[in-house]
Amino acid sequence: MSSAFDFEPMPRRASVAVDVGGVIVGGAAPVVVQSMTNTDTADIDATVAQVAALHKAGSELVRITVDRDESAAAVPKIRERLLRLGMDVPLVGDFHYIGHKLLADHPACAEALAKYRINPGNVGFKDKKDKQFAEIIEMAIRYDKPVRIGVNWGSLDQELLTRLMDENQAAGSPLTAQQVTRETIVQSALLSAELAEELGLPRNRIILSAKVSGVQDLIAVYAMLAARSDHALHLGLTEAGMGTKGIVASSASLGILMQQGIGDTIRISLTPEPGGDRTREVQVAQELLQVMGFRQFIPVVAACPGCGRTTSTVFQELAQKIQEDIRTSMPVWREKYPGVEALKVAVMGCIVNGPGESKHADIGISLPGTGETPAAPVFIDGQKAMTLRGPKIAEEFQLLVADYIEKRFGHGQAAAE
């Protein structure tokens, strides 16, 4: 039965597929998760360690800064070290100002990178702009590499902005400065892509991005870009900020765009706290795609938020422990238990929603709330399987989860089939 309130994501916008070192971006491929290092690329040990950590966390592409000769010289060594570690992760070179020179002077770097990222706003200035842009495109053609043309409103092409502002001022019904800025961002990306194609770079070697730091601006700019091209699109909110603010801003903007079918690869740009874990941005990107139903990366642990009926912290501690165990175990589980990403575990704190939510999970437990009988029913595949009692309920449930995973996704399943 259909309803006026039935709601599903819009079909993915049709885009040209781009092969980035064996990872397909666009076309019918799933939305790709990527990240960026914050190490000095010339520090090979630190960069290899961070790329490895990001890739292990689930980043399918990793971008590194290539800003000087020492960084460019380090790239092939970084690539070689990663391959020795068994990590064939595509590396994206982030170029600004002198990318044309670095690629020409360091052919091993140009070969080792899986993609070049260039910014039309600072690839060159005045009469040098088109020449230096062309030199990078020629290198991409020579080495058969894709290019992301990444416009950023913090380094916008000032000549184009000035021209559009002047044209707008002369118009009968001028747009606001914000609207002209948005149009400039879109035109900068599209004109650069057009020039790249004129220079001979195939359409299936071009990805576009148009990053701003305001949620509404980002949604507007990408909607405009999506309507006016079929290039694969890289989504990201630049300067999103730290902590909760950065997560909320990125999730709100990227979530809306992906719900509209826009976006082929995403990066969650979080400002890490001093000494913070860089892999957090990968985790947030995966969780965003998973909660929206676009991809499955890790088993889901559903847990109630707690209320006056759940003064005990047992259910919170158990939910946290299971979540941590899952995240820690996933690198092994992906190989050992194919399909385990689809697992849903429920850890509930009282009788109100506990049994119902647990029945909807693959395996769930409803712990006793305040004043309730000290017993915890366990539900497996929608049916009540047992009731746990005593001081070791949490430990016993963890063993049940491990046993369920082994039987459903391990060799036991294969033998049964």
Curated annotation (Swiss-Prot):
InterPro entries for this protein: Dihydropteroate_synth-like_sf, IspG_bac, IspG_bac-typ, NO2/SO3_Rdtase_4Fe4S_sf
The keyword Lipid biosynthesis is assigned to this record: no
Pfam families membership: GcpE (PF04551)
EC main group: oxidoreductase
Residues engaged in binding [4Fe-4S] cluster: 304, 307, 350, 357
GO biological process per UniProt: isopentenyl diphosphate biosynthetic process, methylerythritol 4-phosphate pathway; terpenoid biosynthetic process
The protein's annotated pathway: Isoprenoid biosynthesis; isopentenyl diphosphate biosynthesis via DXP pathway; isopentenyl diphosphate from 1-deoxy-D-xylulose 5-phosphate: step 5/6
Molecular function terms from GO: 4 iron, 4 sulfur cluster binding; 4-hydroxy-3-methylbut-2-en-1-yl diphosphate synthase activity (ferredoxin); 4-hydroxy-3-methylbut-2-enyl-diphosphate synthase activity (flavodoxin); iron ion binding
Top-level taxon: Bacteria
Catalytic reactions of this protein: (2E)-4-hydroxy-3-methylbut-2-enyl diphosphate + oxidized [flavodoxin] + H2O + 2 H(+) = 2-C-methyl-D-erythritol 2,4-cyclic diphosphate + reduced [flavodoxin]
Cofactor note: Binds 1 [4Fe-4S] cluster.
Keyword set, alphabetical order: 4Fe-4S, Iron, Iron-sulfur, Isoprene biosynthesis, Metal-binding, Oxidoreductase
Required co-factors: [4Fe-4S] cluster
EC number(s) stated in the UniProt entry for this protein: 1.17.7.3
Entry function: Converts 2C-methyl-D-erythritol 2,4-cyclodiphosphate (ME-2,4cPP) into 1-hydroxy-2-methyl-2-(E)-butenyl 4-diphosphate.
Name of the protein this chain belongs to: 4-hydroxy-3-methylbut-2-en-1-yl diphosphate synthase (flavodoxin)
